[in-house]
């Protein structure tokens, strides 16, 4: 039996990292500082990609490793794939 895993790196993160390929509709169990929750995946998620573990409003930070890694360009629901199609970077050109 294949064991599929996700990792929440820091308590303040609003995204998980997928350590397996997942299909939409699968359920992942997540340990949060507020208690364990189950998240139903709304999208197919490839190994190494991010999954929203909390609702993220458009313009809000994407937090991984306890640090902001970008901002949501649209609302992201719990269980959605978080990637370049719904995240913008915070880098500014000089």
Predicted regions: what they are:
Residues 2-94:
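N-terminal small-residue-enriched
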């Amino acid at each position: 039996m294949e064991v599929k895993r996700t990792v929440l790196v820091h308590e303040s993160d609003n995204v998980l990292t997928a350590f397996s390929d997942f299909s939409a509709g699968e359920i992942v169990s997540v340990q949060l500082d507020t208690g364990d929750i189950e998240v139903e995946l709304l999208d197919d998620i490839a190994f190494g990609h991010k999954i929203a573990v909390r609702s993220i409003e458009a313009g809000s930070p994407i937090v991984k490793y306890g640090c902001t890694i970008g901002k949501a360009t649209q609302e992201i629901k719990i269980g959605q794939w978080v990637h370049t199609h719904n995240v913008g970077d915070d880098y500014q050109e000089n």
